[in-house]
């Protein structure tokens, strides 16, 4: 099919080439032979009057013109897929949809477990692929490579829609035998002590690291781990401290000895966990259904936390649990 002289099938080829960056892999991804993909490149070059790709070994290196075309091409193909090809009434009980979601281990444990249990009842054939943090969430959303990001709101894209899930705050955790931690933790105490810290991605700071940087502060990290749930073992029997979301700290304290202490609040205000999705997915029935479940389960998390927060006088925590 041609539109103003352009064979629209060539856009599919261009998108595959930009994604795979290898001729054979790109051809395979859209069920073309390698000669057919080579012919598509020739036709693309003729239409756009640009080389589009050069070879560097076996890898295709896009030209600036190809880089400029790629976002619009991917968005157009995604829009066609969502609004025309896959636009069917969504029946959760009969759907075998798979959702790709980026979220932290904290949100997996304290929030997403609830979602999975509920979906198993309402849509038993629906599946999830949970992915680690990426340093380029904007790019993943733009390409439609993920269905949802569940992140602190401060790290979300400004160009895609989002919805609040619930508010959270940080606390300091340590081994009950920690001899260096004072009852009232000052910011000087906090930054001078040895820390166990969670890291997400190669370049993205954690929330607490981001907050410290905003105040020009830096802590002394003795052990870095790839997630919050790996922190407690590295506190046991040491004078190290760590920074955890309150809900997660209370969850751990039910099973292992933990001392929980308030953090200096001007440095560590409450933050918002939110869900974000690609803008073209906004009217997708499956995405709408999933978002509704997220919001309903988040309200239950918020409600169940209110009782605990009230018992702890909203901001005062025991020094040891």
Curated annotation (Swiss-Prot):
DNA-binding region in chain numbering: 23-42
InterPro entries in UniProt: LysR-type_TF, LysR_subst-bd, NodD_PBP2, Tscrpt_reg_HTH_LysR, WH-like_DNA-bd_sf, WH_DNA-bd_sf
SUPFAM superfamilies: Periplasmic binding protein-like II, Winged helix' DNA-binding domain
Residue ranges of domain HTH lysR-type in the record: 6-63
Pfam families linked to this entry: HTH_1, LysR_substrate
Membrane listed as a keyword: no
Protein's UniProt keywords contain Protein transport: no
Entry keywords, A to Z: Activator, DNA-binding, Nodulation, Plasmid, Repressor, Transcription, Transcription regulation
Function: NodD regulates the expression of the nodABCFE genes which encode other nodulation proteins. NodD is also a negative regulator of its own expression. Binds flavonoids as inducers.
Protein's name in the database: Nodulation protein D 1
Natural source organism: Bradyrhizobium japonicum
């Amino acid at each position: 099919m041609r539109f103003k002289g352009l064979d629209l099938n060539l856009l599919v080829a261009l998108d595959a080439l930009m994604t795979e960056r290898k001729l054979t892999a790109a051809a395979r991804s859209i069920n073309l032979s390698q000669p057919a993909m080579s012919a598509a490149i020739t036709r693309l070059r003729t239409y756009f009057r640009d080389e589009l790709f050069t070879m560097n070994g076996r890898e295709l290196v896009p030209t600036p013109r190809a880089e400029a075309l790629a976002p619009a091409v991917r968005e157009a193909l995604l829009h066609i897929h969502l609004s025309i090809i896959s636009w069917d009434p969504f029946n959760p009980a009969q759907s075998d949809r798979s959702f790709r979601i980026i979220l932290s281990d904290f949100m997996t444990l304290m929030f997403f477990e609830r979602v999975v249990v509920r979906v198993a009842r309402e849509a038993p054939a629906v599946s999830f692929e949970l992915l680690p943090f990426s340093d380029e969430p904007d790019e993943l959303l733009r390409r439609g490579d993920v269905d949802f990001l569940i992140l602190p709101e401060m790290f979300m894209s400004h160009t895609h829609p989002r919805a609040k899930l619930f508010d959270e705050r940080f606390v300091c955790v340590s081994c009950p035998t920690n001899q260096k931690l004072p009852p009232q933790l000052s910011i000087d105490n906090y930054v001078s002590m040895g820390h166990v810290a969670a890291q997400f991605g190669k370049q993205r700071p954690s929330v607490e690291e981001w907050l410290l940087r905003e105040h020009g502060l830096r802590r002394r990290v003795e052990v870095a781990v790839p997630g919050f749930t790996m922190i407690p073992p590295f506190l046991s029997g040491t004078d190290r401290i760590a920074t955890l979301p309150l809900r997660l700290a209370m969850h751990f304290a039910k099973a292992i000895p933990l001392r929980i202490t308030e953090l200096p609040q001007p440095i560590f205000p409450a933050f918002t966990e939110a869900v974000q999705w690609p803008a073209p997915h906004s009217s997708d029935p499956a995405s709408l259904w999933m978002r509704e479940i997220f919001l309903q389960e988040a309200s239950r998390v918020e409600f169940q936390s209110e009782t605990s927060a009230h018992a702890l006088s909203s901001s005062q925590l025991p020094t040891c649990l």
